[in-house]
Amino acid sequence: MKLPMAALGFVLGSAFFFLAGSVYSQEPSSQSPIFPTPQRLRTLGQQPDDGPVIMLNLLKFKPDGGRAAYGRYGAIAIQQIRRRGGEILYGGEVAGLLGPGSEWEEVVIVKYPSRAAFLDMSQDPEYLQALPHRDEGLDATLLYAFRPAEGLTRLDDDGDVPTVDAAGADAYFNINLLRYKGEEGREAYERYTANTFPLIAELGGRPVLRLVGEQPLVGDEEWDELLFIMYPSREAFLGMLQDPDYREGTPDRTAGLDNTLFLPTRMTLGGAR
């Protein structure tokens, strides 16, 4: 059901009230680096390497050709990723709920079979030759390493993390980066999700990925988890925010989070598209 524009405006205001509260978003800065430092790459290589690593890329392009330049980099990077058994789990454009929103423009979620595979790619001569296109294209980026949340991440029949299904032309995929207020904050947020996930299911949505943060490779914020949720439409998500049952759980969300970054997106890569 489509909401009238006046109602959407009211809901949008409520969305910012319920989703913001005492939490803060990290917007891109052109002063930030766009390449991982050697120290951060070494730290990644020192982590246990007994499963896949999933990289979240948030992208802001330079004006006047930045997106095209990054596309030239991406064409080579995708070949390198696939050569090592990795894949693009999801690619999408950041979509404002009623108009311009975050200054981040695109999100790409990439799965590598191991940390060694990612580090090997970062030293490949062919990949290194593509990096000037990345530099030419990006004004800012966030690159963060995650691993599947044991017992919480939906796996395919092979026990692997699946690509994200397209889920319909109107689907919204909401990225939630979460940092908790310690263990008590995590418990409060779990109460919030226990209340909210059934409401999402009633709308025809679902949690798609739940990942545990390992370390930033580019960017300074520390994140505990990434929660990636599909809604069948923008209206479904905004309508849920007005549900009294949803509102009942929002104090636990505010109590649980020390920081968050919320990005609504529309799919451009992944699944059936």
What does each of the following model-derived ranges do?
Residues M1-F10:
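Bacterial N-terminal signal peptides that target proteins for export
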Residues F16-V107, P113-Q123, Y127, G137-E248, ...:
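Short S/T/G/P-rich N-terminal loop/turn motif that feeds into the first structured element of a domain
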